[in-house]
């Protein structure tokens, strides 16, 4: 009888504010990153941190969504994975960070993508999804180490909301899950949470 090969289940780390700031500072200071790639990474890290979007969902965003977030505090995005609409919200801090990353004048084409291909003149052209995901994840791993991916933003946001005793149904709705059980699987206490919970 053949034995099933055991595989290690690696720890998936969460990205909290500490890791987010580390990513932003590193990218801003890295002179080897081309300006357009730097802009895409900074935008991606910020939007993922505040919304918990998936990278492929982020690539669907247009400048019109950013304008709505800044003016109204919310916007709706159609998610291709679930074929459903997700409402994104922007508080004061998120708006402040968006204003640092987007130049929005009245002449700006609101149909331009948030994440764009640098080699193309039209900012309506997006980057190949697989290429962008690989680029973002390799940069995250380079800065934070193994165990971190773009999905760590999503997990970190859900975990922080759970730690603040926010109702799981509210977290599920905020993050765009159709099932609360999915949201529960994401809640992953940080080392600090575990240390703080020690009773002996």
Language model features by range: what are they?
Residues 4-24, 83-93, 108-111:
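DNA breakage-rejoining catalytic core of tyrosine-based enzymes
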Residues 17-51, 55:
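Basic, Lys/Arg- and aromatic-enriched nucleic-acid-binding interface segment
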Residues 20, 91-146:
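Active-site/catalytic core of tyrosine-dependent DNA strand-transfer enzymes
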Residues 27-35, 133-173:
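Short, basic (Lys/Arg/His-rich) helix/loop patches that form interaction surfaces
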Residues 47-60, 164-166, 177:
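A short, glycine-centered helix-capping/turn motif at helix boundaries
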Residues 60-96:
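Conserved tyrosine-mediated DNA breakage-rejoining catalytic core shared by Y-recombinases
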Residues 66-68, 166-185:
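Short, polar N-cap/turn motifs at the start of nucleic acid-interacting alpha helices
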Residues 79-82, 175-200:
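Catalytic-site neighborhood detector that most strongly recognizes the C-terminal catalytic loop/helix
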